[in-house]
Amino acid sequence: MRINPTTSGSEVSAVEKKNLGRIVKIIGPVLDVAFPPGKMPNIYNALVVQGRDNEQTNVTCEVQQLLGNNRVRAVAMSDTDGLMRGMEVIDTGAPISVPVGGSTLGRIFNVLGQPVDNLGPVNTNTTSPIHKSAPAFIQLDTKLSIFETGIKVVDLLPPYRRGGKIGLFGGXGVGKTLLIMELINNIAKAHGGLSVFGGVGERTREGNDLYLEMKESGVINEENIPESKVALVYGQMNEPPGARMRVGLTALTMAEYFRDVNEQDVLLFIDNIFRFVQAGSEVSALLGRMPSAVGYQPTLSTEMGSLQERITSTKEGSITSIQAVYVPADDLTDPAPATTFAHLDATTVLSRGLAAKGIYPAVDPLDSTSTMLQPRIVGEEHYETAQRVKQTLQRYKELQDIIAILGLDELSEEDRLTVARARKIERFLSQPFFVAEVFTGSPGKYVGLAETIRGFQLILSGELDGLPEQAFYLVGNIDEATAKAMNLKT
């Protein structure tokens, strides 16, 4: 018999005596289980399938529906291979619970909180259920402050809020995961902050790359694992929909403990929140619910709200969440990204057009927004610089049709100057990443906010009009651009 990893043996044996059901139907990852009259488990309770003839099984399920006639419908958190009708099922009497606290740092977990990194069991008895209420209104902290990332385009145009929710929007292959990896790297090095990474329905290869990158950069300390700065929770593409639907909650539960009990500021990375919605859609169809717009589940807003409302700042500490959002067919009006938009403080939109030009990070400076870009929060200097950068880029965008038809020579002198500066700004928004050193051959750069503002002010003022635009491509601060220009001239 397999014991739920978050329930001790004595508790299981006590439950075993009073609440045992049997599988009556299996449809893929969905099980129907019959229980004795009056002993129905609650919604979200964890059920453990008991193997026949003392054979161990590895299947934990979560109750999703009460069907009547003493039957429940549950969704499996792992493959249901080998399960048969008539197998006994134990009601654990509680939701899935996962280990929390400092012992989780430097480790990789699955949706059930079991370590999957071959480094032995987790040294903690402290567990927490993955289903909880959001903090009460009175507990929330409403202070506004900027979260510096060291990435120029992000810090200048859609600045991130400490304790806020940020969405990285983009189609396939524009650099969402790479940007998340760079943010984890920069934040661990510059701020020494703790991070929890939730890999929700993404490529296993990317999860492996992230783990190896963490070890190389020292975010995961191989010599002394408890000194690590990140906990990783994976429910990747090959997992059943139940695991992909709940792995985000597992990561969030670990982050909540650091916030509420350790009173720390913690970062929660979710890659990819669209896969959370997609898994919910699969589960909804398997449970027989009528689909809503574009085939999504009718409970889309509720499911998204129950996750997002728990990601917040309280008087004890904060959770700053950065979520990659895959945009199907680059359509921002799709219900999944559109529902996510409502919860975010900042949106960083990644553009395929910029990626095609080789400008990385491919953050669209005009589409990306932030509620923090206000003079009373970021200061007049930052606000004015950001607005002038946007105006210059917007004017360049308006002129592109004329340039394509008539050429640059037909523009006025003022417009030609605007185009030249906009092209320099566009290239200066690119930046070499630490986590992409292997691909680019350029060492990564962390650029402070003051340096970023100074650089763009110099371009806008016209002081650097004489420098070639390629000098601004893939550099850190403005001094590197001027040095690169000198090298290009010689």
From Swiss-Prot:
Subcellular localization is given as: Plastid, Chloroplast thylakoid membrane
One GO molecular-function annotation for this sequence?
Answer: ATP binding
Tell me the SMART domains matching this sequence.
Answer: AAA (SM00382)
Protein role: Produces ATP from ADP in the presence of a proton gradient across the membrane. The catalytic sites are hosted primarily by the beta subunits.
Give the family per the record. Belongs to the ATPase alpha/beta chains family.
Tell me which GO cellular component terms the UniProt record holds: chloroplast thylakoid membrane; mitochondrion; proton-transporting ATP synthase complex
What keywords would UniProt list here? ATP synthesis, ATP-binding, CF(1), Chloroplast, Hydrogen ion transport, Ion transport, Membrane, Nucleotide-binding, Plastid, Thylakoid, Translocase, Transport
Pfam families listed in its UniProt record: ATP-synt_ab, ATP-synt_ab_N, ATP-synt_VA_C
Catalytic activity, as annotated: ATP + H2O + 4 H(+)(in) = ADP + phosphate + 5 H(+)(out)
EC number(s) per UniProt?
7.1.2.2
The root-end lineage is: Eukaryota, Viridiplantae, Streptophyta, Embryophyta, Tracheophyta
**GO BP, sorted A to Z:** proton motive force-driven mitochondrial ATP synthesis
Q: How does it assemble?
A: F-type ATPases have 2 components, CF(1) - the catalytic core - and CF(0) - the membrane proton channel. CF(1) has five subunits: alpha(3), beta(3), gamma(1), delta(1), epsilon(1). CF(0) has four main subunits: a(1), b(1), b'(1) and c(9-12).
Question: Looking at its record, which EC class is this enzyme?
Answer: translocase
For this protein, the record's InterPro entries field holds: AAA+_ATPase, ATP-synt_VA_C, ATP_synth_F1_bsu, ATPase_a/bsu_AS, ATPase_alpha/beta_chains, ATPase_F1/V1/A1_a/bsu_N, ATPase_F1/V1/A1_a/bsu_N_sf, ATPase_F1/V1/A1_a/bsu_nucl-bd
Stated membrane topology is: Peripheral membrane protein
- Name the domain of life: Eukaryota
Q: What is this protein called?
A: ATP synthase subunit beta, chloroplastic
Residues the record lists as binding ATP: G170, G171, X172, G173, V174, G175, K176, T177
